[in-house]
């Protein structure tokens, strides 16, 4: 896997080390254990999915993670990406609208030995009031346009990675870097994300 990631341009040693220290088998459903390191999407509960290994690591590589950072993730899923970020960063807050996924991810993170990752059920479309600012923000549900709420959560020098719906069927990963009051946008690559659903789920 490491050789495949390196050949795909992932050369950040600290990120690769964090990925190797975080077994994806702890985060995937039992019936998909043989495919955890493949490029395919792995179905989760509540209609969610776990990104293919290459896509997950590519997203984290685009964030340029560093020790000491505070990170926000919107869309917890299995908890895998939060776990990898937790190996590098000082603190990770990850939120999801589904309590089922929150509870499952919490168990997965405990099995992986992560103590600096906080998992919370919250409305991912509304930001995280009262949580202050973050060095990095990763969003894994698509918005129709750049979400100002999350841009305001960035420190100067911070980076936001968010899927943006370019059309009804076309989604692209966009990176936003903040410098003071200036926000610089960079369109990166297409990705298979679905539009974000507002409000927390009532029954799942």
UniProtKB/Swiss-Prot annotation:
CDD domains: AdoMet_MTases (cd02440). InterPro entries: PCMT, SAM-dependent_MTases_sf. One of its GO terms (cellular component) is cytoplasm. GO terms for molecular function: protein-L-isoaspartate (D-aspartate) O-methyltransferase activity. It is found in: Cytoplasm. It comes from the Bacteria. Keywords: Cytoplasm, Methyltransferase, S-adenosyl-L-methionine, Transferase. One of its GO terms (biological process) is protein modification process. It holds the Pfam family PCMT. Its main location: cytoplasm. Its EC number is 2.1.1.77. The keyword Thylakoid does not apply. It is an enzyme of class 2 (transferase). It catalyses: [protein]-L-isoaspartate + S-adenosyl-L-methionine = [protein]-L-isoaspartate alpha-methyl ester + S-adenosyl-L-homocysteine. PROSITE patterns: PCMT (PS01279). PANTHER family: PROTEIN-L-ISOASPARTATE O-METHYLTRANSFERASE, PROTEIN-L-ISOASPARTATE(D-ASPARTATE) O-METHYLTRANSFERASE. Belongs to the methyltransferase superfamily. L-isoaspartyl/D-aspartyl protein methyltransferase family. Catalyzes the methyl esterification of L-isoaspartyl residues in peptides and proteins that result from spontaneous decomposition of normal L-aspartyl and L-asparaginyl residues. It plays a role in the repair and/or degradation of damaged proteins. Monomer. This is Protein-L-isoaspartate O-methyltransferase. The gene is pcm.
């Amino acid at each position: 896997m490491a050789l495949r990631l390196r050949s795909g341009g992932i050369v950040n040693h600290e990120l690769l080390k964090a990925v190797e220290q975080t077994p994806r088998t702890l985060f995937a459903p039992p019936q998909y254990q043989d495919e955890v390191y493949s490029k395919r999407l792995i179905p989760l509960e509540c209609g969610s999915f776990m990104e293919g290994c290459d896509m997950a690591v590519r997203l984290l590589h685009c964030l340029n993670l560093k020790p000491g950072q505070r990170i926000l993730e919107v869309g917890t899923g299995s908890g895998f990406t939060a776990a990898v970020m937790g190996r590098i960063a000082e603190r990770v807050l990850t939120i999801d609208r589904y309590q089922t996924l929150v509870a499952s991810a919490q168990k997965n993170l405990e099995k992986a030995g992560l103590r600096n990752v906080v998992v919370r059920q919250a409305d991912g479309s509304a930001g995280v009031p009262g949580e202050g600012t973050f060095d990095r923000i990763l969003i894994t549900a698509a918005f129709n346009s750049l979400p100002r709420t999350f841009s305001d959560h960035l420190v100067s020098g911070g980076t936001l990675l968010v899927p943006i719906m370019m059309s009804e069927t076309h989604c692209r990963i966009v990176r936003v870097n903040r410098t003071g009051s200036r926000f610089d946008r960079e369109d990166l690559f297409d990705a298979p994300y679905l539009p974000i659903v507002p409000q927390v789920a009532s029954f799942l």
